[in-house]
């Protein structure tokens, strides 16, 4: 999340460098979480994994919406890293589902998955610029809940 350094700087009064270092904990989680999401998906089932990870990221962003300047910095970092685990693992699990949606269009679906991820990044940065930070995180949590409900209707082909 490219807005996290700004969030930590504004919320905790950190220097730009310190805020960037703290926010890097979110990106650091990507190293194990994204492949881990794919692994979990392979092991326990794609749809079930996506449902659990999407519920987890909704809870994670709900937690992020509660972070404030009265929180200890370590607790805010812990919530961000927990939230990041579900987001990054969810990304790995999403790409595990791509070939199971419509096998004849796997490439197109993979391309759209990546493209719409970038569209989401732009939309959420605009939301961050216009909403109070707690409402911004609640917006993401609410979107995750909508995603969860949508996943309930997901049909996968069986190879």
Task: List each model region and its residues.
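Extracytoplasmic gate region of multi-pass secondary transporters
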Residues: 1-27
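Residue-level signature of mid-helix packing/kink "hotspots" within the transmembrane helices
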Residues: 27-35, 118, 122
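Helix-to-loop junctions at the C-terminal end of transmembrane segments
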Residues: 33-45
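Cytoplasmic membrane-interface "Motif A"-like loop-to-helix N-cap segments
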Residues: 43-54
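C-terminal ends and interior cores of transmembrane alpha-helices
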Residues: 55-69
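Intracellular juxtamembrane helix-capping segments at the cytosolic ends
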Residues: 89-102
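Symmetry-related core transmembrane helices of the 12-TM Major Facilitator Superfamily/SLC fold
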Residues: 136-153
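Conserved small/polar residues in nucleotide/adenosyl-binding loops
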Residues: 157-159
């Amino acid at each position: 999340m490219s807005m996290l350094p700004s969030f930590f700087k504004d919320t905790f009064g950190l220097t730009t460098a310190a805020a960037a270092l703290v926010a890097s904990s979110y990106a650091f989680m990507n190293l194990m979480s994204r492949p881990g999401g794919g692994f979990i998906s392979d092991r326990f089932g794609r749809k079930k994994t996506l449902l659990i990870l999407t519920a987890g990221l909704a809870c994670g962003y709900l937690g992020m919406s509660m972070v404030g300047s009265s929180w200890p910095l370590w607790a805010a970092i812990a919530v961000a890293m927990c939230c990041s685990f579900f987001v990054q693992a969810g990304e790995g699990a999403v790409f595990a589902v791509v070939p199971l949606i419509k096998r004849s269009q796997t490439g197109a679906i993979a391309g759209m998955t990546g493209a719409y991820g970038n569209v989401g990044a732009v939309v959420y940065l605009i939301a961050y610029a216009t909403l109070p930070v707690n409402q911004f995180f609640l917006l993401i949590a609410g979107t995750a809940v909508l995603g969860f409900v949508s996943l309930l209707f997901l049909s996968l082909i069986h190879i």
